[in-house]
């Protein structure tokens, strides 16, 4: 059975059972501070389990793109090593929100597996929760009794809290679960060892395929459980594992989910993959298989994340995506011999394979490919640089063990993979101080955890089952009651309180727009300031540094009108900017992200070349023309999404929209948007682009200002121009005067360079007398009174006259220390010397660094006082 048919039959089955089929949510999560990515099928329905919203149907089914790489569900280091873990995977799921419970969930799961998919009953085992004295939760007798009617009792297994009690996190909805496991071993293997003994024991052919979670409890901050007001069902079935079972394979990677990618990797790299049924393979072949599995898995995770709007970066979710991609690159580099980018080429195959089920991977194909290629180029350079640095560490090492601190520095500062370090050391007969490395890694993790630790108390509920109303589109103040609150403590923010109101005029941070600030006024006039507003799990959270004295009273919630006006001005300007870019650069332009603050706006968009100054001016003029036209805001609320799209509204990629949406229209600009906006474009006053640049391959970023910030910008420019005129003695044409000064300066620089070259030549004879012969090397380390360019000329002058030369010159031109190293080419190889390594090592003494070629390199720094020590240490390289 093909994977496309497996997916379709699942959705068709649950549709026949009265379930509404919904699309997958984006793999990247928004408005949930506890998760970076969708790591399970239920993540997009979390707000319903928490009671913060009502689903469109009490019965829902879907296939959800998931990513598991960090936290509780950390599978990253296992991926590729075994045959059934993945970073990105599909989770087939069906849900009941206060509707059916255990009986229907279990019976339907059994019906689908045994009657539709026709998995033999004798290949299946199930588990039920054995109970927990610690939590005072009894054995799940109900689930056991249901299973008894479907399967022999000797195939029902009792599971402990670890395996059969599912929790959303440290706090929140949870409950017992019942897992279904499939035994894919041969008849001969089954005769030798019972499958029952292998369930939940990490056997590659006895694996869990479906988990039915019965949500009936809430875990409180103190660890205790309380009953939920309604019972829910949350099930998840691993699509890749199901395909393995239905296609008669013993590895997920041998199914048609992965084999097209694997065959393409073979074609590109020349490597060969052996499927799981091939036995007796060599260790070298096993390593190659692992590398191919890693690449095939990771390109899916990275491409889907990029397609959903998450670019690789150095922080947060972007850093996780970069880590995944770099793991794939280094496996290719180490075990497949790939020294050039190749992973980006797999996006085409992935698009062909999965584009029908997930159209975003097809529409964003070019972006995914370009971003991955740029990341590959960058990291391959890092690997080359790391190899040079590792060579320097090895060269300066005494003994047969490399210090773990040194290895950690390569890993942490330069991004050089520790497993690659260990491999290279092993090849050279050296050992890695793994204990020292792990110690440094653990210290870093502890520092990171301590810095980001957040402790949240339980919600103190004042009003049960209250639905929050947002009134902030229409007014900036509202009489409110606090419905619940809690205390939160973090290293970053200290103690703060989170408040939820029955109604709020405050806009919570979402959709790229920052949250409102303002205050809460009690009836006696006491004020509590609201320092920020967030949107979490479909509820607006108001952050304060203290609680009102009478928490159950009635308050006037007031938004800071000035900040809201500035933020709204910038948000409306992003819509006009988007329209202008599409008009002037082309309709290929797509918004890839934005940040709207009260002070400025940032807009990321797809475009594969730098936007010229002329184009930027044209875009700026377009937006300002729309502002001068005084276009009124035409807003439509709660209209069907299909109708909005038919009316020409633009939907932003990576955003999750409900069935009912809001549209914002200014003239011909129409977008789906939940943010706040000006009533008329004239309220924006003026739009000014202040910067344009690249964010990633194919992604450009414009930063701009409007309103008061634009006025302040022009006032500042006027002051600067006046100061320039004054400095030029009130020249009538300051531009002409500046160009004349630049021309004069260039002539003087040329004269100065000629003088310095002459000075260097004159110094050559004196310095030649100071050369010392050490181990067959003509050595000199000295500070010279030249600029860096002069030091370079001097080094080359000496190099042209003397063989076996090793010189290090230091300069302190304009207070900036600089080191210049020249090594004769004949001793670079014979003495295993490298100028780049030399300046990197000596650069530490001047608080800097640098690099270059093996025979010539430079390093800059900040500490002039370190020059003496750097020069003194230079001789160690030739001793």
Swiss-Prot record:
Subcellular localization(s) per the UniProt record: Cytoplasm
Keywords: Aminoacyl-tRNA synthetase, ATP-binding, Cytoplasm, Ligase, Metal-binding, Nucleotide-binding, Protein biosynthesis, RNA-binding, tRNA-binding, Zinc
Catalysed reactions, semicolon-separated: tRNA(Ala) + L-alanine + ATP = L-alanyl-tRNA(Ala) + AMP + diphosphate
Amino-acid positions noted as binding Zn(2+) in the UniProt annotation, renumbered to this chain: 571, 575, 673, 677
GO biological process terms held by the UniProt record: alanyl-tRNA aminoacylation
Record-annotated membrane-spanning stretches: none
GO MF annotation terms: alanine-tRNA ligase activity; aminoacyl-tRNA deacylase activity; ATP binding; tRNA binding; zinc ion binding
Names of the cofactor(s): Zn(2+)
Domain remark from Swiss-Prot or TrEMBL: Consists of three domains; the N-terminal catalytic domain, the editing domain and the C-terminal C-Ala domain. The editing domain removes incorrectly charged amino acids, while the C-Ala domain, along with tRNA(Ala), serves as a bridge to cooperatively bring together the editing and aminoacylation centers thus stimulating deacylation of misacylated tRNAs.
Family the UniProt entry places it in: Belongs to the class-II aminoacyl-tRNA synthetase family.
Name of the featured protein: Alanine--tRNA ligase
Taxonomic source organism: Flavobacterium johnsoniae (strain ATCC 17061 / DSM 2064 / JCM 8514 / BCRC 14874 / CCUG 350202 / NBRC 14942 / NCIMB 11054 / UW101) (Cytophaga johnsonae)
Gene: alaS
